[in-house]
Amino acid sequence: MTDEKNPSYLNLNKLTKAGSVLNTPPTFSIYVLKLVTEWMVKSGGLEYFEEKSKRQSNVLYDFIDNNSSQVNCKVEKTYRSNSNVVFNFTNEADNENFIKLSTEKGIIGVNGHRSVGGIRVSLFNSVDDEMFEYFLDFFKQFLVENK
């Protein structure tokens, strides 16, 4: 493996020139990658996670679109992410209240990017259906209580 595109620790030319002491590969990161990959394969593979991602994001976007008097997503439907759903409340004070209350309910990291604010819900692979439903129930209740 002498291709310059390979990481240094897999590039035999670089390793030979450095007397095999070029650097230590990030062994813990590689090990965690192995564990995550095994978990994903065991859970159903890429097809399963793609389907779950699309299903969860579609449910959340539909909910947002159907409650446009209180919440809106400014991203055009064509460009919406399946991983990070971003939106704002029409009442700006609700953004901070939502973040505060969600944290109290154990839902963390929903604050939007520091440059744009709002809310960002990450639907990464580790977010299973039970977690998603917990969040969605919280979101529905929040809208009812903040009409």
Please describe what each predicted stretch is:
Residues 1-61, 76, 147:
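Active-site C-terminal subdomain of aminotransferase-like
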Residues 17, 81-85, 117-119:
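Short amphipathic alpha-helical segments
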